[in-house]
Each structure stands twice: as C-alpha cells, then as structure tokens.
Design a protein with these regions (language model features):
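Conserved functional hotspots at enzyme active or ligand-binding sites that engage polyanionic ligands
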Residues: 1-116
Length: 116
C-alpha cells in the first residue's frame, strides 16, 4: 500500500530500546511522497494520549479529538522521529492530518532538528 505525508497510520513500534516510544499506536507519516512511493521505509512520528504529557515543549503538537480525526486528545511527538519498514510495521491507515496541523508539525520538526 502506498502512504502519503500526513497520513495517520496504526504502527507496531515493538521492539524498542530505552526511552523510545513503543507499543501499537497511531503515528503520522512525515516523509515526502516521492520517497514514500519508491522506498520500503518511511519516517514517522508517534502519537500519544495528551493525558500522558506532563509538560509542554516546542517539539510537541497537540491534536484534538474532534478536529484532527483522533480517538482522543493526543500529542504528536516530533522529538521521536523513527524510520520504519512500512510493509512490516504499518497495520493500517486510520486518517489524515489537516493541512494547518501539518504546518504546526513541520514547525515543531524544524525546531527539534535546528533547521531554523
């Protein structure tokens, strides 16, 4: 299956090591569409329940249950960029991030990666 930048996908992130985000969870594809078309791997950021986040950081983007197609209020963790094998780790596509919210994610990625 071909995925696009901004797709929300359910991903099996196990096994992990140390402080890496784990379990099966929603993730957002951040890799460009050309690379997604031709590469077996893709770049994702994991999403976690907003109630699990104790502090606000510039690398976190809040996602609304009602506006952003999430099962509950959540946080995109732009500080946890992962490269995954799309065929073996992605279970299914579950939604798509709004363009405005993707711009916020892009900004958080720029801050996290010092690309500003």
């Amino acid at each position: 299956m071909e995925y696009q930048r901004g797709d929300i996908v359910l991903v099996d992130l196990e096994p992990v090591r140390g402080s890496e985000q784990g379990r099966t969870r929603p993730c957002i594809i951040i890799q460009n569409d050309i690379a997604n078309r031709f590469s077996p791997v893709t770049k994702i950021i994991p999403v976690t329940d907003a109630h699990n986040v104790k502090k606000s950081y510039p690398c976190l983007v809040y996602l609304s249950q009602t506006k952003d197609e999430m099962a509950k209020d959540s946080v995109a963790q732009c500080n946890q960029i992962r490269t995954i094998d799309a065929e073996n780790r992605i279970i299914k596509r579950i939604g798509r991030i709004r363009e405005q919210k993707m711009k916020e994610i892009d900004q958080a990625l720029r801050i996290h990666l010092a690309l500003m």
